[in-house]
A protein has these predicted regions:
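Surface-exposed interaction regions enriched in Ser/Thr/Asp/Glu
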Residues: 129, 138-174
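Extended beta-strand solenoid/passenger and fiber regions
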Residues: 50-52, 56, 68, 72-145, ...
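Extracellular/lumenal ectodomain signal focusing on beta-strand-rich modules
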Residues: 6, 64-66, 118, 154, ...
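Acidic, low-complexity glycine/serine/threonine-rich segments
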Residues: 1-92
Length: 174
């Protein structure tokens, strides 16, 4: 399980000699420091408000910051060792935590891009409070209407008969 931390900040250029990149480097240092102290042990709790306060206090020019923290899990799709082609199979990805219950319009589940039948796709849960997973193209059109489901209370993501052509990022995992 990985935590993806996306931080946006606002700062006042007139009260600092630092460049935006230099302030960003300070912020990355604060984020790394926070996670070094507050994570890695059983039952650790990450407090966004405390992390935001540390970021805001890291330089007097920072006016405020916004943080988005997402859990991510990686899995490596199975390949035929002889041909190198991906193989159709089922996958269960266990987040070991609850996953956000499905919302009306905003997906609770998303993935990196991959190619299916020559179309660049990603995974999302279907709209309207659904736990059904779909493959969608870049414009949000449904390419495959049901590739599995997720269980919010157990943190399990189930992909059924999942088969891709390639992984768009060039990584070996999704």
């Amino acid at each position: 399980i990985y935590l993806d931390v996306i931080t946006n900040f606002r700062y006042n250029q007139s009260v600092t000699n630092l460049t935006r990149d230099a302030i960003q480097t300070k912020i990355v240092g604060e984020v790394n420091s926070y996670f070094a102290v507050n994570s890695g042990k059983f039952n650790d709790t990450i407090r966004k408000s405390k992390l935001t306060s540390k970021i805001d206090a890291s330089d007097p020019s920072i006016l405020g910051s916004d943080i988005d923290i997402k859990m991510s899990a990686r899995f490596t799709p199975l390949q035929n060792p002889t041909t190198g082609n991906f193989v159709r199979t089922d996958y269960t990805i266990n987040f070991i935590n609850n996953i956000q219950s499905p919302l009306m319009q905003v997906p609770s589940i998303s993935s990196d891009r991959f190619v299916v039948n020559g179309i660049s796709c990603s995974i999302r849960n279907a709209p309207l409070h659904s736990t059904t997973l779909q493959a969608i193209d870049i414009q949000g059109n449904v390419v495959i209407s049901n590739i599995g489901n997720y269980e919010p209370t157990t943190g399990k993501v189930n992909l059924v008969g999942f088969l891709i052509d390639s992984i768009s990022s060039g990584n070996t995992y999704l």
